[in-house]
Amino acid sequence: MKVCVIYDTKKGSTEMIANWMRESIERKAEVRMMHVTKVDSLKDCDLVVIGSPIYYERPLKSVLKFLEQRQNELKGKKVAVFVVCMAGIFGHAGKTYAEKRYVGALIKRVPGKIIGTAIIRGWIRKPDFSQKVVVQKWIKELLKNLEVKS
């Protein structure tokens, strides 16, 4: 199984989170981690994990553009999406808002089968290493679901 983790970042937190994902995946499967502007092909990816930080109430344009331009390659693929934002600090209401507004903006551009979504709490200055456990748990669940559904 080959997993491709694709991301963009502004200040580095989404890249760090993508690296945590890569570390978790490489224990169980082959993994490639790529910046959204450096993706060559998705042909050999069994699972595509795509993530974006949230700025000014939306995912980065580069990630949205990637999803729109890669429609044909994503058709028939299993896809998981994640966003990195501060909505989680607002409890259930913040999470519900983020699912609809941020995750929804990504999902509606994915022609493949969505097998998972995540809202990961970002940070302003110092990395929040407690989120590494959240990431590891999500990846473990994704891979388990992928094995069951394959």
Regions found by a protein language model. Give the residues of each.
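N-terminal beta1-alpha1 ligand-phosphate binding loop
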Residues: K2-E26
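FMN-binding flavodoxin-like domain, especially the glycine-rich phosphate-binding loop
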Residues: M16, E23-R32, D44-L47, S52-S150
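N-terminal short beta-loop-beta anion/metal-coordinating cradle
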Residues: M33-T37
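Short amphipathic alpha-helix with an adjacent loop that forms part of the alpha/beta core around
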Residues: K38-K43
